[in-house]
Amino acid sequence: MIHHTINFDTLTIRDCLETFELLKKELIVVIKKAPTNPLGFHRLVSGMSQIANWAQCIWDTEGNYTGVPKEPLDPWSTDRVLVQRVTAKEKDDKPTGIFPKGKLDWHSNLNGPDRADGVGLQGYAGVEDTVTSWLDTAAAYDAMPQSLKDKIRYKYCSYTYNMARWADTPWHQDQRWKSLVNKMERKDDIYRMWIEQENIAGVKGLYFYTNNDLKIWDDDIGLYEELKEFLFQEKFIYHHEWDVGDIVLSDQLLTLHRRPLRPDAVFEKRILHRLTFPISNTSEPKFIIEKNKSCYSKKELEIFWK
């Protein structure tokens, strides 16, 4: 994790690209108390990469539902953007954000090697005295004993996307988001990835997403528990205590994040804005797909990764 300073009043593409290079190497970049006008956040992310979840930016900053955009909006050529909100706040008895309350355990946006492998969160309102935690697998890999590295080398996991294991989502929000989720999901939610990973900047770490259903192929007895016990140590975890305006950017290939359980009233006041974007997957063919192709047979590649 590294702290970074940006002047959003004079933000340039060069500032964005410098931040992007920092993110590739450090995996977690924290910008404290940035302006809460989402225009700056959107310009930063679009200047670094491209906004992947533009079709899920369906609210204005007051929580009014605006409908699903038909095309992405260039934040550099407008003075107003729509947002994706993370909040339990309701308006007219309707949800105004995703992941509203309850459990949000260790997870990543990278639910498959084709996905956007970057996430940005900004504290918009009511975030004081709340925490989000990030697990840095590169730090864990650096500290890993050679004996464990030898056990995970050439091992891959088969994953099945299972949001119910890591998030509590009320049924009414599930229904509201069903059409959007279907547009964003792959036809088949089963995917494979090597445990050892390396991002586009050459940073080595792990992809070990324990809260999706997973099977380690050719597993040695006890490897799952041994790796999980080593990985989720406090010394590899960064706890971010939110202030209004804070932006946290993170690499989703080599980190996981979670929020602790809090009373519903806390999340009914708390509003985060969320953007997803590619980091290693900015290239074509996508970098992470190419790195994990050898987990698949030729026939499977023809089906999944055309």
Per-segment meaning from a language model:
Residues 2-246, 253-306:
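Non-heme Fe(II) oxygenase catalytic core, chiefly the N-lobe of the double-stranded beta-helix
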